[in-house]
């Protein structure tokens, strides 16, 4: 009877459940976020690019992460320079487009005024063109600048998305403890005793 009571009162350990790997769970969540349709705006597209970079970090092993970090760090400087160049081009094209439209409006209002229309028409006839021809040329130039600016903006958004992706990969890889090859080499060399790295030290008797 006493043995039965001791068996009933003895504590029992809870059943062991299989642990869910955190890396696989995070990878599944990121893959679902990347595959959840197309981004509605530019912010969501950049966010999906960051999710894609995070997915790559979890998939890659330590050596692959180290190599990708080095390549991404080298390419980031060039991509930032290209982004700034595209940004300046877009601004200049926008200013040119506004200038053409302002000239078209000014020329149109000038031709509508009876006091200055005759003077302007006579001045244009001396060079063999009319006010309508100048207006058409300026309008066509404004349309061309607008189309070219649209292509530049598209390229600019693509470069920005690549920058976000590479910066996210580098940041997450560093948080996971991955070091760049150059940093690792510097730390190993600094930890060696004096004269051991070069191999050219002289032995004293």
Swiss-Prot record:
- Annotated region (Disordered), positions in chain: 177-205
Q: Where is there biased composition of kind Gly residues? A: 196-205
Q: Which InterPro entries match?
A: Orbi_NS3 (IPR002565)
Q: Which domain of life is it from?
A: Viruses
The protein's job, in short, is: May play a role in the release of virions from infected cells.
Family the entry assigns? Belongs to the orbivirus NS3 family.
**What's the protein here called?**
Non-structural protein NS3
Supply the source organism for this entry: Broadhaven virus (BRD)
Q: What is the lineage of its organism?
A: Viruses, Riboviria, Orthornavirae, Duplornaviricota, Resentoviricetes
């Amino acid at each position: 009877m006493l043995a039965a009571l001791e068996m009933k009162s003895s504590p029992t350990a809870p059943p062991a459940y299989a642990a869910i790997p955190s890396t696989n769970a995070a990878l599944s969540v990121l893959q679902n976020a990347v595959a959840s349709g197309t981004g509605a705006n530019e912010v969501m597209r950049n966010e999906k690019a960051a999710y894609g970079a995070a997915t790559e970090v979890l998939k890659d092993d330590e050596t692959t992460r180290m190599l990708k970090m080095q390549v991404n760090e080298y390419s980031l400087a060039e991509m930032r320079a290209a982004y700034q160049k595209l940004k300046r081009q877009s601004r200049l094209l926008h200013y040119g487009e506004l200038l053409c439209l302002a000239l078209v409006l000014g020329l149109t209002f000038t031709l509508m005024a009876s006091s200055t229309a005759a003077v302007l028409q006579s001045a244009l006839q001396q060079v063999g063109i009319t006010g309508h021809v100048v207006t058409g040329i300026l309008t066509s130039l404004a349309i061309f600048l607008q189309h070219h600016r649209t292509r530049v903006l598209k390229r600019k958004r693509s470069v920005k998305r690549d920058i976000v992706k590479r910066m996210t990969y580098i940041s997450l890889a560093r948080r996971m403890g991955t070091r760049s090859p150059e940093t690792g080499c510097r730390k190993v060399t600094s930890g060696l005793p004096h004269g051991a790295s070069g191999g050219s030290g002289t032995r004293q008797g």
